[in-house]
Amino acid sequence: MPAMLLGAMLAAQALDAPSGKVVLTLTGLISEGNQGKTKAEFDMAMLEKLPQHRLKTRTPWHEEVREYTGPRLRDVLAAVKSSGKTIRAIALNDYVVEIPMEDIEKYDVIVARLANGRPMTIREKGPLFIMYPFDSSETLQSPLYYGRAAWQLKAIEIR
């Protein structure tokens, strides 16, 4: 299914309020919130309801190839009807990185919730990890893109 069509379908659905523990908060340039118009909270079940994608890749943080599973970042952003040019990904340790929307459209970046089929603990860089398909392009195998792969993701601000 073309990404734009999927995005339109996701954007057409109202965003439910989380019923479990909030694992991701989106703020900024969004028009479909569930905590007021410009704030959206997701629990793990909400992220699981989005189309799930798997990618196998090497990272600088692990010796072996790992398989990551989660929704595409573009689908998460479509669910809140985002309209910005960049996002700021914020980790549990307050690490912040800016990611241009061009990355999100060009590459199949996911919000990984599983590594090798298992939920990730905080110690394992979870529970959420922005993951690029590093092995799909030599361009992505650089400090610039490795730095954009935010682990222990807790929030996204759309600008």
Summary of predicted features, one role per range:
Residues 2-9:
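Bacterial N-terminal signal peptides
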Residues 13-159:
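N-terminal intrinsically disordered, low-complexity segments enriched in P/E/S/T
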